[in-house]
Amino acid sequence: MTRVIIDGDACPVVDSVIELTTGTGIFVTILRSFSHYSNKVLPNHVETIYIDDGPDAVDYKIVKLATPEDIVITQDYGLASLLLSKVKIVMHHKGHLYRSSNIDMLLQQRYNNAQIRKQGGRHKGPPPFSKEDKKQFERAFKSVIKQL
């Protein structure tokens, strides 16, 4: 059975995923650190798992829980690289799919930016998440779940 696992601490498309999976038989598991705790009532097909705060604690739990039938949504390139051979699909919250053909470039870019910061330099970060980004994600996610 397909499940969507969301790296939920900073994911701007949680509500979209919940809405688009309602009535499909697809379950959603949101993993968050306790510092992002919420009392929000969620539909029955959605489970939230809270993880102790700590560097990469949520990422490690996602790797541990993920199965070959899962779809994982994350903006973390390192986590995505660990999951590519483990799950069905790894998606970014802007809608693009992580693949073995693009992950090395993304990781190299992340490394280069870290080196610039380490030397006291600055680099341009990503633009703020927009309504168009949300629409693009929803189109891509609909396409993914349609193919299941």
UniProtKB/Swiss-Prot annotation:
InterPro entries linked: UPF0178
Chain coiled-coil ranges: none
PANTHER family: UPF0178 PROTEIN YAII (PTHR35146:SF1)
Family per similarity comment: Belongs to the UPF0178 family.
Entry protein name: UPF0178 protein SH2212
